């Protein structure tokens, strides 16, 4: 009695039709007619690696030791398997681990490492770490592959791929970074949790719409450079939490289920990318993988398992299916960047540091000082990148925020930012560099703006008169640039400003300004200043407040409602603007977009540009809804209305990794340009 799992010899691959299976239990017999259909002999190419969270599962210092040990263990595994003729391939998804290893390795270890890379037994991803591309400036993404270029030059090796693990989605600039740096292959292994509605934690449509999809990405259809992008259909974590004594049974079950899925969805290829991380994040090397694969292939005619190299896998796929691979452009708009705004003050600082470093680097090259300080720039780049690495804190950061394991991880995370500040200040002094923001509005002989008016019951702008027309939308409940505080998740409670007082106002021939103080839940000492310089078409908002710390779920937003509903939305920077939703690839985030520089709303008569240099995220159509379904947020699949927009200032909505509460002083500006 009870549940029994029985394996028996199957049928030859060529056998088709039906058969009857008879099961005898005591004196009873049960019969089941089984249809036998043609199936492909799938080749599952195992890409074995350890997902490198710099923190989360362990303190960052312990992760460094774990990943160094993994490299040493993998070198031993490769050496031992060569002796018995079994294939061993180990992938390193984050070169942070390689830099740590090489810093302390002896010469024989370094030689063994380089030889393993050249032989294809060690496969390096070009990424220094798994970063959130939606937080990063275009030039900053170059720093992500900077160490890979150093390794190539120093050891005469070639790094041909990038592996992004856990993170769902990648920006257009993130994709272009690889083509610009001549990296031909991108393996995406997003977060995967079978029993969640989207089959992953806050992954939106990435798994369901983009899993097992292969395409060439180009910056534009006519571009010559291309990137082969392949999302592993079961992410990177399909084999987590499997003990060695249950490996055979659970792999058989999960591979079988995967084959059925591939058949039912009419997967057009017979080659499958299968990411494999053992046990959990920052897991070990499976030194018995070769024996397991050999035993599997001796036991089963189909499917075949292969211990593979991601570079040779992608090359094999191109060779076999190259003429069938579609060419796409755009981005897989990402999802996890919202968590960074659980530490909004620090993220604003790192974003500013990135922008300032980009300008300082241009200055150093212009003044012929780059070569002298290139190592200092590398150290600065490294810390900015590490703050944008996707691991913000511990796995129990929300459930146990006061635990030393949690607070120490945040201390170390913040130390990357603190170190970057020190390095920037020291380097700018040596270079004689003073940063000047590029935020000056274009002057005009006569502004198309004739007036703006503030609503003293909301603190927002009620009217902006442009060529005798009011551009502020009145059907939306919020005024233009109004601050909105949201408490809770389901249902959300929205709070608006109150006790608004005028601190200063001016309306002269040169400018109109009004400075307000106000009260808003969750903050104190809030002041807002609106400014229109009358020989420009820009209205600026300068905000300052002190955030009060709370563990209750919360968020803050700035509203941008406009008249009419026919606005077209574009976002990006001066090099590239994307159209929402036309330039979003399948699986993209439709609820908020990641913006490097500005958003633009256009219709037949107007163009409105919004710049918020301190922030990355804009919610489209509505303030984000964090209602849970079976304990998880389910993301909208349909495009949202492009009006209104909301600048997403802060939140603590995550259930893990990011911070449970935040405080600190906020000071920032938002620029609204009208044409």
What are these regions, as identified by a protein language model?
Residues 88-98, 127-130, 162-171, 189-195, ...:
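Short, solvent-exposed turn/loop segments enriched in Gly/Ser/Thr/Pro and often Arg
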Residues 1-44:
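Extended acidic/polar, glycine-enriched regions
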Residues 154-161, 270-274, 538-540:
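Short, surface-exposed connector motifs at secondary-structure boundaries
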Residues 174-179, 191, 211-213, 240, ...:
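C-terminal (or distal) subdomains of carbohydrate-active enzymes
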Residues 43-45, 50-53, 203-436, 571-675:
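Active-site and substrate-binding clefts of carbohydrate-active enzymes
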Residues 29-67, 77, 88:
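An acidic-aromatic substrate-binding cleft motif
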Residues 40-49, 69-85, 100-160, 170-180, ...:
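Catalytic alpha-helical scaffold of carbohydrate-active enzymes acting on polysaccharides/glycoconjugates
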